[in-house]
């Protein structure tokens, strides 16, 4: 692996081997680090700043990224299954085709991330911010998405079946052909969203705000579901369904849980440290 240095950062230690040892600890700052294809299984990124890093196809199974900054980084086709990402900043990052199944990303910043075709089955993202994210074809079945910001997302053909999406903000999103079957949408805000071809079979919609939402082409909706939600004159529904008018202003509370304090790096011979050259 190459270990480039710059005026701002330098690698004090680096690996020449193809595989990076398990339980590696990485910290400090490294802008535009190249870690594509590396085996970083169980690695601990302890409050690190790895902005604009390239980790295409990297193995990060069970890695600890809590409190780190990976804004603008490329994780496409990477394996992050079971990774801990609480409170981390991934603004503008690319996770297209990546495996995030079972990952824990509560309170993470995922604004404008690309998750097209990603696997997030069973992932925990409570309190995360995915404003303007691209979720086209992503699998979020059985994921925990309570109090999450999903406003302005592009999520065509994504799978949210059996997901918990209570008290979340899905306003102005493109959810056409999405699978919401058996999902929990209680208290969620779907205002202004597009849901043509979306499947709501068995979804729970108690106190769901559908003002201005276009559900005219949605499938699996029943009057009993819609009767528990509320809307307005701009709400579009399938034929023969009616909705009661919302009273007052809908407020979605999305305060994320506090991120855990990153643990101290373990004592190990296999340590990568990135520090400022000052």
Regions found by a protein language model. Give the residues of each.
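Tandem repeat scaffolds
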Residues: 3-268, 273-277
């Amino acid at each position: 692996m190459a270990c480039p240095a710059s005026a701002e950062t330098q690698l004090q230690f680096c690996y020449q081997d193809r595989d990076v040892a398990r339980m590696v600890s990485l910290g400090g700052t490294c802008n535009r680090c190249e870690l594509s294809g590396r085996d970083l299984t169980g690695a601990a990124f302890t409050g690190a700043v790895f902005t604009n890093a390239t980790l295409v196809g990297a193995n990060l199974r069970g890695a600890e990224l809590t409190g780190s900054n990976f804004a603008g980084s490329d994780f496409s086709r990477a394996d992050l299954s079971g990774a801990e990402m609480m409170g981390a900043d991934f603004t503008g990052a690319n996770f297209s085709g990546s495996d995030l199944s079972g990952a824990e990303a509560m309170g993470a910043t995922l604004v404008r991330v690309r998750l097209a075709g990603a696997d997030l089955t069973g992932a925990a993202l409570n309190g995360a911010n995915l404003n303007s994210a691209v979720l086209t074809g992503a699998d979020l079945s059985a994921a925990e998405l309570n109090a999450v910001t999903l406003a302005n997302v592009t999520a065509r053909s994504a799978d949210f079946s059996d997901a918990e999406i209570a008290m979340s903000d899905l306003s102005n999103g493109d959810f056409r052909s999405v699978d919401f079957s058996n999902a929990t949408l209680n208290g969620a805000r779907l205002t202004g969203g597009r849901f043509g071809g979306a499947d709501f079979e068995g979804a729970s919609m108690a106190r769901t705000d559908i003002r201005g939402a276009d559900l005219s082409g949605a499938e699996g909706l029943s009057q009993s579901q819609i009767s528990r939600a509320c809307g307005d004159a701009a709400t579009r529904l399938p034929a023969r369904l009616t909705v009661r008018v919302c009273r007052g202003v809908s407020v979605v509370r999305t305060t994320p849980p506090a991120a855990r304090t990153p643990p101290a790096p373990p004592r190990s011979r296999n340590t990568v440290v990135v520090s400022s050259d000052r």
